[in-house]
Structure formats: structure tokens, C-alpha cells
Amino acid sequence: MMASLFSVFDPTSSFLSNWLSMLIPLLFMVMSFWLIPSRPQFLAKSVLMGLNREMSLLMGPASFGANILVIALFLFILFNNFIGLFPYIFTATSHLAVTLSLAVPLWISFILYTWIKETTNALAHLVPLGTPAPLMPFMVLMEIISNMIRPITLSVRLAANMIAGHLLLTLLGAQGTLENLYVTSIVVFSQIILLMLEFSVAIIQSYVFMTLMTLYASE
């Protein structure tokens, strides 16, 4: 029996630091340079080109470098979400230490770039159009607080969704018993369905993280 339901999220074990699982996607990326392009690779390239076009619509045609950055972030989160669904592999994106380290630096860089390059627009964005003069200080304070909590909500959303799915899988797995074949069959079938949903959640959350970060940058 598990000592704790959250023991599956422990970052270390007696064998090896589980944080090294974050490097597994790099192995697949390096191997792809020496492999003959296959149909899955062409499909992945088509998806990435579609994401690049979508990011260009949100951030402008002159944002090619920023597009590469957010798409690389999307791939990193997606790979870590996927490998975390396999048995005995640590889910790095279920920890705020990882999600915050991805969201906060990008958010700070976007904020600094905006305030340095477009100071007037940044100041105007703090006060919505048509705000009465007595409410302007309050609106400025609210806008500052809203901007400051954006990376936190972005990180918590990703980590919470990853934790919720893994907890459900763990709870279902703990209900199966070898003595009752009927109950075990139901549990296994339920886990398969839930695992398929978790793969969908992994894709959706990676896309949401990338899209919201792009929208924050475009503002």
C-alpha cells in the first residue's frame, strides 16, 4: 500500500533523480536529425507549420523568433506530459517548480520588452478606455495585480490538470484486486478510457499554455 496518495509525485527515488526524465525528449529530438523523414515526421512538421501560422496571426508577421520560442515551449511541455503518462516515469509538469520556471521568465521578458520598447502603449494599457477619472488609480492597481498573477495562474492550471489525472489513475489502480476478476476488469477498462482522456488533456494543456503565453505577449 502507498504511504501517501501523492507519493507518485515524489521527485527523487533511491535509484536516480527523477528530474532527469525531463531530458528524455532531447533524445528523440537528437535522433530525428539522423533518421530518414517518415510520415509521422511529415505530419509533425505540418502541425508545427500550422502552429507557426497561428502564432503569427496573434503576434504579427515580424515575430518569427518569438514563434520559435513558444512552439519550442509547447513541444517541451507536450513531451513531458506524454512521458509522464507511462509507468515509472516522473511527471515533471505536475510540479510548480517546473511550470513556474517556464512561465515566469517568459512573462518577465515580455513585460520588460513592452515597457522598454513601447512605454506609452504599456502605460495606456493600464487604464481602459472610458474609465472615469476617480476610478483610474483603482483600475491601474487592478491591472497591475492582474498582470502579476498571470504566470501564477498559468502554472497552477497546468500543474493541477496533470496532478488530477494522475491521482484518478492511481485511485483506480488501488481499487483493483486479483481475487475479484470482475472488479479488476472494470478497473482496467476504466483506466484505459481515462488514459486516453489524459493523452487528450496533455495535448490541450500544452496548447493552452502556449496560446495564453502568446496572448499575454501580444497585449
Curated annotation (Swiss-Prot):
It is found in: Mitochondrion inner membrane. Its main location: mitochondrion. CDD domains: ATP-synt_Fo_a_6. One of its GO terms (molecular function) is proton-transporting ATP synthase activity, rotational mechanism. The chain crosses the membrane at residues 16-36, 57-79, 96-116, 122-142, 158-178, 184-204. It is a multi-pass membrane protein. InterPro entries: ATP_synth_F0_asu (IPR000568), ATP_synth_F0_asu_AS (IPR023011), ATP_synth_F0_asu_bact/mt (IPR045083), F0_ATP_A_sf (IPR035908). GO terms for cellular component: mitochondrial inner membrane; proton-transporting ATP synthase complex. Pfam families: ATP-synt_A. Keywords: ATP synthesis, CF(0), Hydrogen ion transport, Ion transport, Membrane, Mitochondrion, Mitochondrion inner membrane, Transmembrane, Transmembrane helix, Transport. F-type ATPases have 2 components, CF(1) - the catalytic core - and CF(0) - the membrane proton channel. CF(1) has five subunits: alpha(3), beta(3), gamma(1), delta(1), epsilon(1). CF(0) has three main subunits: a, b and c. Belongs to the ATPase A chain family. PANTHER family: ATP SYNTHASE SUBUNIT A (PTHR11410:SF0). Mitochondrial membrane ATP synthase (F(1)F(0) ATP synthase or Complex V) produces ATP from ADP in the presence of a proton gradient across the membrane which is generated by electron transport complexes of the respiratory chain. F-type ATPases consist of two structural domains, F(1) - containing the extramembraneous catalytic core and F(0) - containing the membrane proton channel, linked together by a central stalk and a peripheral stalk. During catalysis, ATP synthesis in the catalytic domain of F(1) is coupled via a rotary mechanism of the central stalk subunits to proton translocation. This is ATP synthase subunit a. The lineage of its organism: Eukaryota, Metazoa, Ecdysozoa, Arthropoda, Crustacea.
